[in-house]
Design a protein with these regions (language model features):
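Short, charged/small-residue-rich alpha-helical element at the C-terminal edge
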Residues: 183-256
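Conserved ABC ATPase signature
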Residues: 84-88
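Conserved catalytic motifs of ABC-family nucleotide-binding domains
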Residues: 105
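Catalytic Walker B motif of ABC-type/P-loop ATPase nucleotide-binding domains
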Residues: 109-113
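Conserved ABC ATPase "signature" region
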Residues: 51, 55, 62-80
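ABC transporter nucleotide-binding domain
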Residues: 127-214
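Conserved ABC transporter NBD signature motif
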Residues: 10-21, 25-26
Length: 256
């Protein structure tokens, strides 16, 4: 989709162009960030990399000045852009990488693992920027990530691809409703029933159990009533299934 590789088979059209065939024109309107590969020049100040990108993308002086100011403020990098890239922490560098990808105000930005290896503070800063720029500039963000925190914080639409085929295309809300079963952490006196309709015991110890219920088949209230009628419940905690489990269920269903 970035136009770097030629496909073995099939085709891809983005903004009316075939990325690898129309690469020179195509790259004018896209930005790319690779989590494990820097797009900045290593031994020079970040600002010098920005200046070089300005020339590469032929960004007018006024537009460059305005865009640079906007991005340095939004990503809080004003104090570090005069520092050589190699001297930056991973979180600082990633914020500068993202700024570089947005300098020419692209219509589409591909972010490959943008939060990989970042601490919690840096992850939040990157995610907040992505949400804000998407809302304010209507920039299309295509995100590839193994961090389910990114999925939960940023995603409106999920596309699942396996073995070269589109397996699923839907909203995060619809997926959550379909796959998000409730987890009941129960502390009790007595003995767990041998049969519990539409409920699965995930973990069990002497007087505690973690029970998953399928809300497409049984209501939460009915499940709790069943347990209350068969056990002396000391404590009950209700949790939603994590995004990790939802993704695992998708992989299982589509045999990826």
């Amino acid at each position: 989709m970035c136009g770097i590789l030629t496909p073995d088979s099939g085709n891809c059209i983005v903004n009316g162009m075939v990325p690898y065939k129309d690469r020179k024109e195509y790259v004018k309107n896209i930005g790319v960030v690779f989590g494990n590969r820097s797009g900045l020049w290593w031994d020079v100040p970040v600002e010098d990399s920005f200046e070089l990108l300005k020339e590469i993308y032929n960004i007018p002086d006024e537009k460059y000045k305005k865009q640079k100011q906007l991005l340095t403020e939004m990503l809080n990098i004003k104090e570090i852009i005069r520092t050589p890239t190699r001297q930056l922490s991973l979180g600082q560098r990633m914020r500068c990488e993202i700024a570089a990808a947005f300098l020419h105000d692209p219509k589409i930005v591909f972010l490959d693992e943008p939060t990989i290896g970042l601490d919690s503070t840096s992850k939040i800063a990157v995610r907040d920027f992505i949400k804000k720029i998407n809302k304010e500039k209507n920039t299309t963000i295509i995100l590839t990530t193994h961090d389910t925190g990114d999925i939960e914080a940023l995603t409106k639409r999920i596309i699942l691809i396996g073995k070269g085929k589109l397996l699923l295309d839907g909203s995060l809300n619809s997926l959550t409703k379909k796959y998000s079963n409730k987890i009941l952490n129960v502390q009790y006196n007595g003995k767990l029933p041998t049969t519990m309709p539409q409920m699965e015991i995930l973990e069990k110890s002497k007087n505690e159990a973690k029970i998953q219920i399928d809300e497409s088949k049984i209501k939460l209230a009915d499940a709790i009533n069943f347990l209350s009628n068969n056990l002396e419940i000391q404590d009950l905690e209700i949790k939603n299934t994590s995004i990790d489990n939802i993704v695992a269920n998708l992989y299982k269903e589509y045999k990826i």
